[in-house]
């Protein structure tokens, strides 16, 4: 199906939140959307993000931490920023690109339950989007 839409999840370091969002996006939206994630910087995939997603049987060990790709950004149908920093510093998006902000706490450097909570919140938000388009 070549006429898939493109959704692009952005956060500061493409380490935790946007990695989880990419994985949930592929699970819930993969049949209709090309799903990508990136950051203003590339901090590497957080090992606890990998562990948290493994807990819900989603393997993100092959996902990479990438900086924002202008080509993907410019052709994206929807850009979703996941933290206030990325929302403020995100490159300008072309007029045809729909951009929304879904804020989630950054679990990096926090206790393990924070990773589980943020993982579940992101999963629920993307599931809702897959069901309602909002």
From Swiss-Prot:
Its EC number is 1.20.4.4. It catalyses: arsenate + [thioredoxin]-dithiol + H(+) = arsenite + [thioredoxin]-disulfide + H2O. The active site is at 11 (nucleophile), 83 (nucleophile), 90 (nucleophile). Pfam families: LMWPc. One of its GO terms (biological process) is response to arsenic-containing substance. Disulfide bonds join 11-83, 83-90. It is an enzyme of class 1 (oxidoreductase). GO terms for cellular component: cytoplasm. CDD domains: LMWP_ArsC. The keyword Cell cycle does not apply. One of its GO terms (molecular function) is protein tyrosine phosphatase activity. Keywords: Arsenical resistance, Cytoplasm, Disulfide bond, Oxidoreductase, Redox-active center. It is found in: Cytoplasm. Its main location: cytoplasm. Catalyzes the reduction of arsenate [As(V)] to arsenite [As(III)]. Belongs to the low molecular weight phosphotyrosine protein phosphatase family. Thioredoxin-coupled ArsC subfamily. This is Arsenate reductase. It comes from Bacillus anthracis. The gene is arsC.
